[in-house]
Amino acid sequence: MFSAPCGFGKTASARALLAGKRVCAISAEDPELSLPAPGGKWDVLLVDDLQWLKDSAEQEALCAAIRENPEKKFVLLTRGTMPGWLLPFQLAGVLTVLGPWDLALDRDGVDRLLAQNGIAVSDTELTAIHIESRGCALPLSLLARHLAAGEKYSSALTDVIRREMYSHFDELVFSRMDLETRRLAMELAPFEPFGPELARIVSGNSRAGELLEQFQAETSALRPERIDSYSYWPIFRRYLLWKLEREQDEARLRALYARGGLYYELNEDYDRALECYSRSGDSGKISELLVRNSELHPGLGHYDEMEPYYRMLPEREILSSPVLIQAMSMLDAMCMDYEGSERWYGALSDFASSRRRSDMAAREARSRLAWLDLALPQRSVEGMLDTFPKAFRLLKAKEIKLPSFSVTSCLPSLMNGGKDFSPWSRKDDLLYKTLRVPVETVLGRDGVCLADCAMAESKFEKGENVKDRMLSLMSKLSRIRRDGTPDIEFAVLGLLARTQIDSGRAGDAKQTLLTLRSRYEAEEMTRFLPNLDAMLCRVDMYLGNDTEVDTWHREKAPKDPQRLRLMKRYRYITQAMAELMLGDEDAALLTLAPLEPYCEACSRYLDSISLHLLRAVARWRQKDPGWRRELDTALDTAYEFRFIRPVTQYGAAVLPLVEGCGWNKDAQFLNELTEGLKQQAVYYPDFLRPRRKMTGPLSATERQVLRLICADKSNAEIGEALGIKLATVKVHVSHILVKLNVSRRGEAKTAAEKLRLI
């Protein structure tokens, strides 16, 4: 059985496979349908349009024919899913079902199809054609016709083919649906994934679930996501969206999106609800949901995702809500518009002072002001030495009720999370004794074990042995998970991974992070995954996993230097590290450039150290003398706080710079850094080293020789194994070393592994 939506080439594939055989072809759509006599001159019965075989008597007749004629072959074609009445044959192993991906062409198949039509395209065009068509027969056949006529592949031609496909769907699919199913199919197109409940709310049709089942049985245009959850095939969804825009006026579309917004609101999916309400133009609902969403996700990085909706609100509506004013102040700060942030802070202060102190709205405003005093990135951490005790007293007096914080901003660090607490590190022992209670009280769940984790991280950054502190933290991990927040857990396990890397156990660090990632993914705590994946990428840099680093850089790196997003700063720095490892120093410098003003304005000392160290490496590789200035700036900042590991973590990449820089403010401090860098260089000698590029391809014989080199065979053993003279082996080895851009046999093995040659 071939089961696939319209356009996947079921009929053409079947006829090609059955060429030369005695075939009896019938269509279940034929009102005069009748099965051929068993003794007829046919070996294969081809039944097309099986989705229209609805009569139970005809179904039973076909089943009987299959059972009673085991010597015959039956090929069934359907646009729908496999019907239940054929399930016994599948379970018995006599029915094989081929789906859409079995019929879709791979990249090589697309290339052969075009070649058969006398069409030559570039590799880039071939890749684009395969991705755009998804290997589907209909768009490929339409494209081949145009290209064979001399037209060039372009976006304009893609649009022409899309319109031709839409005409095909109009005639062969859409026109055959009843009006009720047509309307439902169109109205569900903007909402994916969807199920019966969403279908009922959006369409207002109590029979929506039943119609969905019928629609799928007849077209298989839906892809099951999970039980009672579907999405359309992308090509068909684009067609339905096009159809919806053509057949519905603006008022009906707004009403449709409003109903979709209601469904998502009821299911507390506020991201999708806001998207729908913005399409419907309902600013009142947008305002209401932004307030509700901020209460569900206080202090988290939802501001980035929600920014377009905040920006579309009228100012008078924002000024009526302390929650929205607070959000605008934080949002402007995250966009580095500190003047705008302070303007909104002033508006919130005015809101509080213009009402009686006992007014609950004034209390809400005071609570939000206290939150901003602690959370705004432009507020210094030195000032927080007074802010925390003040907030502690107000909480005790029940004058404010603080929203929750994200003390780490979803980063694997407390010292360098929502704030950079480097200045506190100078007096970490004293502050632990005096501020631990007020800080943990003010932060509530976010304060559980915070002080212990911060203390361990502070000592770690200063180069101390934190083994016992880490053991103590790991013993408290269950308490953090029970009473605290995943933010602190991420900080603790992030610190554990860093200590493992620092002791030469990067493989253990990767396992630590992968285990945490699996748990976060299973519990749908997706807000941590981007930074967790970036940290995994850093571990892969230590391990020399070029392919994994390249994959992260290609698929997950931010790559938006024109619009700095502060919540992505850890990823920007990781991106620059990846670009250095990939040998693109100019790209690394471009990635880092927007971070410098932020580091200066918000006193981000630890990020500044990384920024200047990475820029020093890039300039050093480019033989730009400016590398000394960059390195001096990084070392000066590290020396100010006596930080060791923010520098030594860059090991082999930074060691030659430090050894030749001439920095002379403190010889003992420099010696500590140098020893730490040497130790990391021993553990990870190729850290951030640009990947080697081959100077030419290896011949078949050279590949065989390389495999034997990697198996630690001597030249004599290689000659004996391949039946060639020793002198010839030496020539091959010499050529291999040149092509791999290495000088020794041991380096050849490492290069071959990284280049996936063995």
Predicted features along the sequence, with ranges:
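Alpha-solenoid helical repeat architecture
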Residues: D271-R272, D282-S283, S321, R357-R368, ...
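Helix-turn-helix DNA-binding segment
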Residues: P685-S734, V738-L740, E747-L757
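Extended alpha-helical scaffolding segments used for macromolecular assembly and cargo binding
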Residues: E250-V323, L331, G340, W344
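Amphipathic alpha-helical "lid/sensor" segments that cap RecA-like P-loop NTPase cores
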Residues: V97, A115-S167, L179-R183, A189-P193, ...
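Linker/hinge segments immediately adjacent to helix-turn-helix/homeobox DNA-binding domains
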Residues: A149-Y166, Y572-M581, E585-P594, Y598-S608, ...
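Conserved P-loop NTPase "ATPase switch" module shared by AAA+ and STAND
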Residues: P38-E58
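Alpha-helical sensor/transducer elements of the RecA-like P-loop NTPase core
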Residues: A12, E60-A128, E132, L138-H146, ...
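C-terminal boundary/linker of central alpha/beta nucleotide-binding cores
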Residues: T124, Y166-E245, A255
